[in-house]
Design a protein with these regions (language model features):
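Conserved phosphate-binding elements of NTP-dependent enzyme cores
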Residues: 1-947
Length: 947
């Protein structure tokens, strides 16, 4: 009997060339190939899109309008499809209320656990809050030694100021004779006048008893009377002994602190029943940051030390500041840091109740006087942020504000009541502060009473299984309360992967996009095991991946190529990894078999005294780290996931340099000092964010080559005759563009039950320009034809114009010869966007004083692409510039001049510098996980080179 399979015929999405392929079901299938070869087009835009579309088609029209239907992919037929689930990196929630625990649903089970077996404790007195019946109170009192003398007290005033005259009169009228005031028993009519400014405690003596058999009925009656008088509270005073306190409500018998009925919503920071009232469950509050208000404390007030009140278009605030300085005799030509504390406080926080006469000038020169207190810079920013109806003003004010931990809940997001409930000695806030690894150990070894263990059995099973899945995909270092908006694409994807395993579905087609991103080699085996576990449940996995270990572990490997863009789109090889390795046409096969490889450089650039030094970095989990970044070499920062690489490079190094050199309004994370910045005059962060947020942005506009191309068209004879300037050839402004589609080339048609349809503009037929503009040609091509050219073709077309050729050649050098000049920025992958940014830097004149920061630049890159990327990065370093890369890829690590290895573990177990030096030096350090893998790779490559 034939094995079940997915049969694709005639796939033509994007650059696919009528691809026919048969993929075995219930297998781990890895698709690989050069960046831009068509892997994602086949996996996501064809197979997943059709699987999802067919599932959605089966739903009612009413349900479809909420789901948003997918377009039918350009393919003849696909047979054998299952319902498809895509796990990619793009759908991370940026909602600050979303955390690792909520996304994985672990938090729902933890809330349920606390609602079912949690024990509330009074935060003021540390005693357990229990609701007790009268019968339970009687039983507890009767356990006292026989002949014990007791008195039952009703606490009616608990530590409150006042004379309480009326209350004492009412007590007397009710027939009670004795009261205990501030610990002293006295006749109710003999109570002296109480000091209204002091706190007092008043308890009514309801009954006096001697513990002995037979008093139960009288005791119960008296207790009921006390509970009625004291709002459910009872104090039993043992003569010559201690006291017992009881409450019939969930309230502290001493202070009355009460906790309502325990239910799951009480532990949700997204519900008004559980959220901290001060920060509304966010754990942080937006407050004015003085370092952003006065970034340069060496400046004087006249030089604009107060950044929000710099003299710009309006003189309103600067004139107000000048008047305040006159009144308080503050020298405006003195550096801000040299003003007295009182003077600084007046400027920042205002004059209090003291009124000052201000003179304001209108724009017509009219003067008006007004007497009022001076508000102060900080209250002014807060008021304008909270009260202004203008979004622009709010955005401007937010630039001077930063997130501060909420003082009420200390960042734990929950109300005082929710945080006073404990299970096995921890409240819910303390539990979610643990890393996944710590939480797993905690819940696997939790000690509960027999009854609680019985209640919690199933809940704990759900919690531990989910934590184990997260642990197994290499996320053990993440804390449960980590905001999902701060996760990298790879981390977010692995979280969703763990959530899917938790659902234990079978018969599903999963399509994954590079799940190994951001994962150290050490954790790769666990990820591969997880993927195999999903397969063993009876699922088909299609994984777009470049990682060598994952490819070798695949049941079926598909190599798409042979090149990228129009040179790709074909299945070069498919079969088991060994079959692909034997295929001479497969570039992937040649790299896997070792016939091709990235060589280790023969000589590494020497590290000189020129360096940037960071001292005492304490960002996130960094433990007071001192580290040097040598200049004019390639630095690679390594370490297991969560060891502190991004904290060191992005939060300390980059932000400090950006603030000092670019004058950016960013706040570097905590560190003591940074030296050597004077040797740098340019800092460039080449990340994978889009090069533009609209289809109007494209590689030609981003690199600046489109300006030069428009100059060429404007200099043609036809353009000169018609009087066309450079602006005529822009599709963003009126004049040359097609006004029917405003230069978009497409028209959007809204469909209610179907997805919005984009159709080519009927007037310009997708060309973006009007007829007159398109009549101007250069070498037989108009401006629209040029935008449709690939970078490779355009390089040849403009080979006689060095300025244009140089810029286009850099795009070819970074491996982007296949993209078109006018390709919308929104359709570029993260790796492609990053390389466009690199290319635009390459054609600029090198100064030898630039520093380039790249965070995992190998994302989305095939080994052959990485080889090309390394050549480009080495070109930057050869020009004297400095490169700092965060990377897990061993091909990049082994070619570095200087390695900085963090660890040894992730999260709290990391944050220290294990070693710095050449790859050979790191490979010799047994404590370094990176070193262990590096040792193997260096030895293997040495053999290959000798062989």
């Amino acid at each position: 009997m034939k094995e079940p399979s997915i049969v694709v015929k005639g796939a033509r999405a994007h650059n696919l060339k009528n691809v026919d392929i048969e993929l075995p079901k219930n297998q781990l299938i890895v698709m690989t190939g050069l960046s831009g070869s068509g892997k994602s087009s086949l996996a996501f835009d064809t197979i997943y899109a059709e699987g999802q579309r067919r599932y959605v088609e089966s739903l009612s029209a009413y349900a479809r309008q909420f789901l948003g239907q997918m377009d039918k992919p350009d393919v003849d037929t696909i047979e054998g499809l299952s319902p498809a689930i895509s796990i990619d990196q793009k759908t991370t929630s940026k909602n600050p209320r979303s955390t690792v625990a909520t996304v994985t649903e672990i938090y729902d089970y933890i809330r349920l656990l606390y609602a079912r077996i949690g024990k509330p404790f009074c935060p003021n007195h540390g005693i357990e809050i229990e609701s007790q019946t009268v019968q339970q109170m009687v039983d507890r009192i009767m356990e006292l030694e026989e002949r014990t003398k007791i008195q039952l007290l009703a606490p009616v005033v608990n530590h409150r100021k006042g004379t309480h005259e009326k209350l004492l009169t009412d007590i007397s009228k009710k027939g009670y004779v004795r009261v205990r005031v501030d610990g002293e028993i006295m006749d109710v009519t003999q109570v002296p006048e109480l000091d209204k400014n002091k706190n007092h405690t008043i308890e009514i003596v309801v009954d006096r008893l001697v513990v002995k058999p037979g008093i139960e009925t009288r005791l119960a009656d008296s207790i009921e009377t006390v509970l009625e008088l004291a709002d459910g509270r009872l104090v039993v005073d043992i003569i010559d002994g201690d006291k017992l306190e009881f409450s019939e409500k969930h309230a502290c018998p001493i202070c009355g602190f009460s906790v309502g009925e325990l239910e799951p919503r009480m532990f949700s920071f997204n519900s008004p029943f559980g959220a901290c009232p001060t920060c509304d469950g966010l754990g942080q509050k937006l407050t004015v940051d003085l370092d952003l208000v006065v970034p340069d404390k060496d400046k004087t007030l006249n030089e604009g030390a107060i950044l929000p009140w710099e003299p710009t278009s309006s003189d309103f605030y600067p004139s107000m500041l000048k008047r305040v300085c006159e009144v308080y005799k503050i020298n405006m030509d003195k550096p801000f840091k040299k003003l007295t504390e009182r003077q600084r406080n007046i400027i920042l926080y205002g004059s209090g109740d003291k009124e000052i006469e201000f003179t304001f000038k209108s724009k017509f020169g009219q003067e008006r006087k007004r007497t009022m207190p001076f508000e102060g810079v900080v209250p002014n920013i807060e008021r304008r942020y909270h009260e202004s109806p203008s979004e622009y003003v709010r955005e401007m004010m937010q630039k001077y504000m930063g997130e501060q931990v909420c003082e009420t809940c200390h960042g734990q997001r929950l109300s005082r009541e929710a945080l006073s409930v404990y299970v096995a000695g921890k409240n819910i806030g303390e539990v979610v502060e643990q890393s996944i690894k710590e939480a797993l150990i905690y819940y696997e070894n939790i000690e509960l009473s027999e009854q609680d263990a019985q209640i919690a059995h199933l809940i704990l099973k759900e919690i531990t299984s989910r934590l184990a899945f997260l642990n197994n995909v290499g996320l053990d270092y993440l804390t449960l309360n980590r905001s999902s908006g701060t996760l990298s694409g790879g981390e977010a994807q692995r979280i969703r992967l763990a959530t899917q395993i938790g659902s234990r579905l079978s018969g599903v087609l999963y399509v994954l996009d590079e799940p190994s991103i951001g994962l150290h080699q050490r954790d790769n085996d666990r990820l591969i095991h997880t993927l195999q576990e999903m397969r063993d449940l009876g699922n088909t996995l299609i994984v777009v991946e470049h990682d060598e270990d994952t490819m070798i572990a695949a049941d079926y490997l598909v190599d798409i190529g042979p090149g990228a863009g129009e040179h790709g789109g074909e299945v070069v090889a498919s079969g088991t990894p060994k079959q692909v390795m034997r295929n001479s046409k497969s570039l992937t096969g040649q790299y896997l078999s070792g016939k091709k490889f990235i060589p280790v450089p023969e000589h590494r650039r020497p590290v000189t005294d020129r360096k940037i030094s960071v001292k005492g970095a304490r960002s996130n989990n960094l433990k007071n780290v001192d580290v040097d970044f040598p200049l004019s070499v390639m630095n690679v920062v390594t370490g297991v996931s969560g060891s502190g690489k991004s904290s060191l490079v992005n939060e300390v190094l980059y932000k400090s340099l950006a603030k000092a050199i670019n004058k950016s309004k960013v706040k570097p994370n905590e560190h003591d000092e940074m030296t050597g910045m004077d040797q740098i005059d340019k800092i460039i962060d080449i990340d994978q964010s889009p090069i533009g947020r609209t289809p109007r942005s494209n590689p030609a506009t981003y690199t600046g080559v489109f300006d030069d191309i428009r100059d060429v068209f404007a200099s043609t004879n036809e353009a000169k005759v018609r009087g066309y300037q450079k602006g005529r050839f822009s599709f963003n402004v009126k004049g040359g563009r097609c006004e029917a589609c405003k230069g978009d080339g497409i028209i959007k048609i809204e469909m209610h039950f179907l997805p919005d349809v984009y159709v080519p503009c009927e007037v310009c037929h997708g060309k973006r320009y009007n007829r007159e503009t398109l009549e101007v040609t250069y070498k037989g091509k108009n401006i629209a034809d040029v935008l449709e050219m690939t970078v490779e073709d355009a390089t040849q077309f403009f080979e006689n114009i060095p300025k244009i050729k140089r810029k286009l050649q850099t795009l070819v050098d970074v491996g982007l010869g296949y993209i078109t000049l006018g390709q919308p920025a929104t359709t570029l992958s993260g790796g492609e966007a990053q390389r466009v940014k690199l290319a635009s830097e390459l054609h600029k004149r090198a100064t030898g004083r630039s520093i380039y920061i790249l965070d995992e630049p190998t994302t989305g890159l095939h080994v052959d692409d990485i080889s090309r990327l390394l050549k480009v990065l080495n070109r930057l370093v050869e020009n004297g510039d400095t490169v700092v890369i965060i990377e897990h890829n061993l091909d990049v690590i082994k070619t570095a001049d200087n390695l900085i290895d963090l660890g040894p573990e992730g999260g709290d177990g990391g944050g220290t510098i294990l070693a710095t030096g050449t790859p050979e030096e790191i490979a010799a350090i047994p404590e370094s996980y990176t070193g262990r893998y590096l040792k193997t790779v260096l030895a293997r490559d040495k053999e290959r080179m000798e062989g």
